[in-house]
Amino acid sequence: MLKFNEYFTGKVKSIGFDSDSIGPASVGVMEKGEYTFSTAKAEEMTVITGSLKVLIPGSPDWQTFMPGETFYIPGESEFNLQVAEASSYLCKYLS
């Protein structure tokens, strides 16, 4: 079953799904802007289009991820994103 999510007054939208091959995940799009997200479970995020500049918890430096690149966010944490142009991503929720 698909689950539709909307954050930051519609600037971030995603569709959650459960896949036999990758488990629980979502695919989404972020408009240009700056965002702070909280996580319950650890997440593996892969950029599909655009780019995401991320301040990963525990890291002092911002890192930019391009299409095909993946980064990991620990569970029960908060992370910051800067998005320079509309960008899409795949997020896998890890156990």
Curated annotation (Swiss-Prot):
It holds the Pfam family Ppnp. The keyword Transport does not apply. Belongs to the nucleoside phosphorylase PpnP family. Catalyzes the phosphorolysis of diverse nucleosides, yielding D-ribose 1-phosphate and the respective free bases. Can use uridine, adenosine, guanosine, cytidine, thymidine, inosine and xanthosine as substrates. Also catalyzes the reverse reactions. Keywords: Glycosyltransferase, Transferase. The keyword Transferase applies. This is Pyrimidine/purine nucleoside phosphorylase. GO terms for molecular function: guanosine phosphorylase activity; purine-nucleoside phosphorylase activity; pyrimidine-nucleoside phosphorylase activity; thymidine phosphorylase activity; uridine phosphorylase activity. The gene is ppnP. InterPro entries: Ppnp (IPR009664), RmlC-like_jellyroll (IPR014710), RmlC_Cupin_sf (IPR011051). It catalyses: a purine D-ribonucleoside + phosphate = a purine nucleobase + alpha-D-ribose 1-phosphate; adenosine + phosphate = alpha-D-ribose 1-phosphate + adenine; cytidine + phosphate = cytosine + alpha-D-ribose 1-phosphate; guanosine + phosphate = alpha-D-ribose 1-phosphate + guanine. One of its GO terms (cellular component) is cytosol. It is an enzyme of class 2 (transferase).
